[in-house]
Amino acid sequence: MKRALLLLLLLATGLFARAGEPYTCMQPGRTLTYERTRAGSGRLERTVTMEYTGVRREGGNTVVEYVFTVRGPGGGELYGGATPMTTTVRADGTTEQDLGASLQAVLHNMFPGAAQSVRGTPALIPAELKPGDRLPDAHSSVKTGILTHTMDITGREVLRFERITVPAGTFDCVVLREHKVERGVGRNRDTVSENWYAPGIGPVRHDSYKYNNGNPVLEATEVLKKY
């Protein structure tokens, strides 16, 4: 369950035509809907909605507010239901996602009486990128009661620009690759993902791979269904 959620949080663009625009949605009233399907079978695993509710200034940054909801194949809400979250956009257009704080918010929904603490460094996506750019590592550690979950995201690299078509439409995207290692009670995961981001929107597609005898094997794909 935690692994699936973190993939969403990471939940994380073609030709510089919109260079400088942050890689996130900043439009209150807009709702982005995603669907994750299993590789091979095409089985629906979940649906995610990100309902953007507000934008506010905080120092020199812009804080984007949204409500994050995950539903299972049958439509029932998971992870404690709707959860308020934020993304920060710095003055230079860099998008900053504190994955630890996002996970902390969901776990608070699920375990409202448990003491919590979080630490780490956020995942950053600069507004202007080029193939070959290396992005800073991101780390998080969330403690809920006696349980601790850590995540280390390394090897973050800009692969290419690509125009792709998903159910929500056709988008010019930047493609990022990253290596993620998770540690927690009953959960030890080591995966690589490729992620397509569109300026002014955010995630458009997410492919998750695990390694089998040293070879990457596609596990699942998540795409933007409605925008």
What residue spans do the PLM features occupy?
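Acidic, serine/threonine-rich low-complexity disordered tracts
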Residues: 18-90, 101, 137-227
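A periodicity- and composition-biased signal for non-globular, repetitive helical segments
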Residues: 8-9, 211
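Predominantly extracellular/secreted and cell-surface proteins with exposed
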Residues: 80-146
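Positively charged n-region of N-terminal signal peptides that target proteins for export
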Residues: 1-4
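Hydrophobic h-region of N-terminal signal peptides that target proteins for export
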Residues: 9-18
